Every structure is written in C-alpha cells, then in structure tokens.
Amino acid sequence: MRFIVASDGHYGQPDTDFKQFHTDLISWVNREKMQKGVDFLFFNGDLIHDDPTLLYDFKNTISNLSVPFYVSRGNHDKVGLDVWQSTWGYPTNHSFAKGEYAFIIGDTSNEKGEYVCPDATWLKTEIAKHKDKKGIFVFLHITPAKWTVNGIECKEVIDLFENTPNIKAIFNGHDHDQDSTKIYGKKPYFFDGHFGGNWGTTYKGYRIVEIYEDSTWQSYQYNPTAAPVLNSFTGKS
C-alpha cells in the first residue's frame, strides 16, 4: 500500500497563489500515481482559508485528482458539521479500513477555528473497533503535544496512542515549518510541511507512506520540485 499525506493548502487565502499551489499538488500526485502508484491521498486539514463558501470551490478543484482522497478538518476550515458531512459524506471524526490496516481521522478544531484536543472517548471506541488490524494510522491536523509553537497539550490522547500497540504512526499538519518526525514514547508523529499558505518550509511538498508485504513500512517527506527524499523513517507493523 502506498499513500500520500499533504496538508495546509489554504485554498482561497488572500495574497497567495492558491490556485497554482493546488494545480501543482494535483500534478505531482497524479504523476506519482503513474510512476509508482498511489492508493489514496490524505489532506490533513486547512483545506480552505476561513471562508466556508470556499469549500465547494476546493472540492471542485481537487476533482482533477486521479486518486481517491480523504480529508480532516483544520482550524481554518470554519465549516459547520452539517456542511462537512454533506460535502464529504462522513463526519469530522471518521475512520476507515483498507485491507489489514485502519485509518482514524480525528477532529482538532471547530466552526470557530479554535484549537481543541481530539475526542478521547471517541478515539477509544474507534481504536477498539480496529483492535484486530495489523496497524492503525492516525490523522490529526493539530499535533496533540506542545512540542511545536502551534501544538496543544492533549496528554490523555498521546497516552492512549502510546498504550495502543497497533497504532503505528500519527500524522500532523498545521505547523507549516515542520517536516520531520517527532517521537513520543515509542510512537512517531510525522509532519509534512505545507503545500499552500504564506509561511513555513522553503519548499512545498508532501509525505509518502509505503507499507510492504513483509509488514515493514516507511515514511518520508518529499520535495517534488527538487526530488530529494527527506526525513525517512522505517517501522514494522
């Protein structure tokens, strides 16, 4: 299995070339699909920039992708739960399975754009639902540890992850200037920089995750304009 995590496109942000940013990402992902294969793309929050009416335009823009995609809500996605559900067909807290692996999407904001901890009670229920899976990968826009300027402390959540053996990794967006791996206990937390917005890493890129048949997996950050592999991490499920 091979998937891509990209975040913080900020569609509609004033004084940014947001349309080109999205055109570029779509081109890069479609090229990856042709060259190496991509099972799905995950947009890890801040799909749009504050104005909820932008969501339709964003959805229309990414219809040019040649791969399936999933989304999480970021603090700039100031959209009501009903609009989110009707747009994407699932709520802001959602999980899905593909083969022997499960993927959990946790909401870390609200319609006001506040920073909130994921719903730990809901997470426990979803984790239990997928307890027999070989591995679980978690997507949260805002990192649940105060190890970045824009992170928030959610100790109940990180302890839950740490004590769940089949959780393999957590993916975070939000901090545009972070593209590395941070370790809490034994769990890796991956950041993917940004592909839009007006601040952050000097390049716009995304993160790739590859799960192999022998149950090993790796994740690395990718700069598609220069093609170096950055911050590679290898694990076993």
Predicted regions mapped to residue ranges:
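Beta-strand-turn-beta hairpins that frame and shape the catalytic cleft
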Residues: M1-I4, S95-I105, I127-F137, K182-P188, ...
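N-terminal active-site segment of His-dependent metallophosphoesterases
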Residues: M1-Y56
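Active-site glycine-centered loops adjacent to acidic/histidine catalytic or metal-binding residues
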Residues: D8, G45-D46, G74-N75, H141, ...
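Surface-exposed cleft-lining segments at the edges of enzyme active sites
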Residues: G12-P14, L47, F103-E114, P144-W147
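Metal-dependent catalytic neighborhoods of phosphoester/phosphodiester hydrolases
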Residues: T16, F43-S63, K78-G89, T148-E153, ...
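Alpha-helical scaffolding within the catalytic cores
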Residues: D24-S27, L54-F58, V79-H94, V116-E126, ...
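His/acidic metal-ligating clusters that form di-metal
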Residues: S27-L41, K112-P188
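Binuclear metal-dependent phosphoesterase catalytic core
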Residues: D179, I183-S237
